[in-house]
Amino acid sequence: LKALVFERNLPRWAASRGASALAGTGRGVRVGPLRLVDMEPPLLPGPEWVSVRPTLAGICGSDLATLDGRSSRYFEDVVSFPFVPGHEVVGEVEGSRVVIEPVLGCAARGIVPPCSACAQGHTGSCERVAFGHLQPGLQTGYCTDTGGGWSNTLVAHHSQLHPVPDSMTDEAAVMVEPTACAVHAVLAADIQEGSTVAVLGAGTLGLCTVAALRHLRLPGAVVAGAKHPEQRRLAADLGADLVAEPGQVRRTVRRQTRSLTVGDRLTGGADVVIDCVGSAASVEEALAVVRPAGKV
């Protein structure tokens, strides 16, 4: 089995962090703890598990941050090392194509009765991701027992598998996981018709969020903050009414909502802000552009 394996190696992690800071995103992988290795395939943890042969696996923003040493160590206790990255996966099980829902909740961990979150169907908020018969791991791609998409083989619980229709290409199917995250965020925001929605960030999740907003046809206006020219073009193509560079989002929202500025805050602002960056700076920006009693 060929696999890219991320090991727990603090000196290499620090080196990758320094390299990415000096040379830019993606440069840390050359000196970081990721290695291409030959290894034994992961064992099936139980009878409800199957082996999956990945066909395509995505490179998530969280994967890039991990490889560049920029990810927070806050989640280290719910990750087990060494692990094979890759949680956006389309693959084959006995000739049938599937996508993987990566969360390793109570069902996958053999925990009965399930925690309150899993019992209500909110498996993404599982309270037992470090317990059960698996090593700790928020999801496939961060658990040493399951393997991940950056390999020839991984194992998955039957509850994680969803069939891929013949009409969907592998390239489209590998986007199911990030698209589902975006759709979930849009639905959870309970956006009212005619609302102004600001989307901060135009990476994969940000662009999927813009597309989800327009597909559901709820907001009156979508304002997207995008760093790079190609992201700005894609955001507009996917339905954003107004697209601004990160430093111009407040001004754009102010004009759209006809708000006034008091200090660095708006008197009005967007009804809903969806933060697709997840940094301290983006949270601060979200609070600056949302209206009083709005939603972030």
Go through each PLM region and give its residues.
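Short glycine-centered segments of the SAM/dcSAM-binding site in methyltransferase folds
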Residues: T196, G294-K295
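Glycine-rich beta-strand-centered segment in the early N-terminal region that forms part
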Residues: E40-A57, S72-Q120, G124, P165-S167
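NAD(P)H dinucleotide-binding glycine-rich loop of Rossmann-like/cofactor-binding domains
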Residues: E76, H87, C106-L200
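N-terminal Rossmann-fold NAD(P) dinucleotide-binding loop
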Residues: G86, G206-L207
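Helix-to-beta-strand junctions that scaffold the AdoMet/dcAdoMet cofactor pocket
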Residues: V290-P292
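Conserved Rossmann-like nucleotide-cofactor binding loop
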Residues: C60, L205, E230
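Cytochrome P450 core scaffold surrounding the K-helix E-X-X-R motif
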Residues: S62-D68
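Adenosine-nucleotide cofactor-binding segment
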Residues: T196-A202, R214-V283
